[in-house]
Design a protein with these regions (language model features):
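Catalytic core of pol beta-like nucleotidyltransferases
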Residues: 1-23, 31-33, 48-136
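Short glycine/proline-enriched turns and hinge-like loops at secondary-structure junctions
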Residues: 36-39
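Short hydrophobic/aromatic beta-strand micro-patches
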Residues: 44-46
Length: 136
């Protein structure tokens, strides 16, 4: 089962209208190839507009009525570095009105991820050599 083009169009049109994002990225089961009848639709967005958590919840609920399935909306700018890297690596851009801004976000995220890996390399090395997190 794949997400239908009609459903994807509805999601894209609704989010562009409501969030005015410069980027929408589809991720999760719908792009990994195991989308099922009961799967939700995972979409990350990048927008200059700040969206409060409750408003995001209301948008997701309104989208359920539009497309007939749960929708999980993720504000890319609020996600953790690891999560952002996974979204970029495994996701599919379904809307971008500013490729330059998208490229800047991609580069910034990969730099943050590289720095994170650098910072935690010693910690992970210690865990690996001890064979335990707590040193026991």
């Amino acid at each position: 089962l794949n997400i239908s083009d009609n459903t994807l169009d509805k999601v894209r049109e609704y989010l562009v209208k409501e969030l005015n994002p410069h980027t929408l990225i589809l991720f999760g089961s719908s792009v990994k190839g195991y989308f099922r009848e009961d799967s939700d639709i995972d979409v990350a967005f990048i927008s200059a507009k700040e969206v409060k958590s409750y408003d995001l919840y209301l948008l997701a609920q309104a989208l359920v009525l539009e497309v007939g399935r749960e929708v999980d909306l993720i504000d890319f700018t609020q996600a953790s570095t690891v999560f952002k890297t996974q979204i970029l690596g495994l996701g599919q851009v379904i809307y971008s009105n500013d490729p330059k801004k998208l490229a800047e976000f991609q580069i910034r995220t990969l730099k943050e991820y590289a720095l994170l890996n650098e910072e935690r390399a010693e910690i992970l090395g210690n865990i690996s050599s001890r064979g335990s997190i707590y040193g026991r």
